[in-house]
Structures are given as C-alpha cells and as structure tokens.
Swiss-Prot record:
GO cellular component: extracellular region; extracellular space
S-S bonds: 61-88, 74-94, 78-96
Signal peptide start and end residues: 1-19
Task performed by this protein: Has antiparasitic activity against promastigote forms of L.major, and antibacterial activity against Gram-positive bacterium S.aureus. Has antifungal activity against the yeasts C.albicans and S.cerevisiae, but not C.glabrata. Has antifungal activity against filamentous fungi A.fumigatus, F.culmorum, F.oxysporum, N.crassa, T.viride and T.mentagrophytes, but not B.bassiana.
InterPro entries, alphabetized: Defensin_invertebrate/fungal, Scorpion_toxin-like_sf
Primary location class: secreted
A Pfam family that the UniProt record links to this protein: Defensin_2
Tissue: Is synthesized by the fat body and eventually secreted into the hemolymph.
Protein name: Defensin
Entry's induction text: By bacterial and parasitic hemolymph and gut infections. Expression peaks at 24 hours post infection by bacterium P.carotovorum, and at day four post infection by the parasite L.major.
GO BP terms: defense response to fungus; defense response to Gram-positive bacterium; humoral immune response; innate immune response; killing of cells of another organism
Length: 98
C-alpha cells in the first residue's frame, strides 16, 4: 500500500511540474517576410513524386513459417481484411477464404 502511495504521489508531482507554465519567451519583432522561402521552393516540395512501395505477398507465410505460426498469421491477416480465414498454399502464398 505504501509503494502504491509513493508511486501515485510521484506521478502527480511529475504531472504538476510538466503542466506548470513556464515564463513566456520574449520574441523580437523581426522582418518575417525575409525568412519565408520563395514560392518556387514551396511548390517544388508540394509536387514531389510519390514513393512506390513494395508489397510482398509471401511475408506472412514465408517469414513466420520458421516460428511455426505461418498458417495462424495468414488466417489472422485474412480475418483482418474481412474474409473468413486463410491458409498458406504450397507456394507459401497466403490464400484467403471467401
């Protein structure tokens, strides 16, 4: 009981210290327009080419088969996608049941 009380008091003290407002920082009035990047730099970063991601179909069956949970991981993967379950076929690809 005493350990619980000490832990609770410690958590409350840390919470109060972190929530206590600090002194406001004085900010000098500067020319903020000079700090803005030019419009072309902004547009170049806005229209970047999206990254192409690799989708590996055999990850659940191949990688987890060493631990003996390949079929269970495949079934959980399929249930997560809204199917009734799944299994690893002979090519180590997860096949979902409908």
């Amino acid at each position: 009981m005493r350990t619980f009380l000490v832990t609770f008091v410690l958590v409350v003290v840390v919470g109060v210290i972190s929530a206590y407002p600090s002194n406001p920082v004085e900010v000098e009035a500067e020319d903020f327009d000079a700090q803005d990047p030019d419009l072309q730099t902004f547009q170049d970063t806005f229209y970047e080419v999206p990254q192409v991601h690799s989708r590996q179909k055999r990850a659940t069956c191949d990688l987890l088969s060493a631990f003996g949970v390949g079929h269970a991981a495949c079934a959980a993967h399929c249930i997560g996608h809204g199917y009734r379950g799944g299994y690893c076929n002979s090519k180590a690809v997860c096949t979902c049941r409908r």
